[in-house]
Amino acid sequence: METKPNALTGTSLSSTSGQTTQKSITLQNSENKYIPQNSSETFGLMAILNLALLLWTLLATLRVTLQKNWPTETTKTTTITQFTTLQKNTPSAKNGLKNTTNKHSHEDM
């Protein structure tokens, strides 16, 4: 009796005097861990892994986008400093809030 194992399909073919029989065996690796037997089990596992990877990628992209566009404390401080400097350099601030638009007042006439 000659037995030829087939590792791809999990079956072995035995032949005795022209008759061929097929026996199904359970696929296991060297550590005796379970190997899925049909495509639906593999598909379910792959679907879960793909969804996890997609979610991870989306969250990483969102985090990077928010970090680029989110105003930091340094940005806020710089903006406030620039605004304060701008207020100090305006003519009305220099002249004590006097009206500087009219060169001649009514008193000069």
Swiss-Prot record:
Its main location: host cell. It is a single-pass membrane protein. It comes from the Viruses. Keywords: Host membrane, Membrane, Transmembrane, Transmembrane helix. It is found in: Host membrane. The chain crosses the membrane at residues 42-62. GO terms for cellular component: host cell membrane; membrane. Coiled coil: none annotated. Residues 91-102 have a biased composition (Polar residues). Residues 1-25, 84-109 are annotated as: Disordered. The keyword Membrane applies. Residues 8-22 have a biased composition (Low complexity). This is Uncharacterized protein N. It comes from Bdellovibrio phage phiMH2K (Bacteriophage phiMH2K).
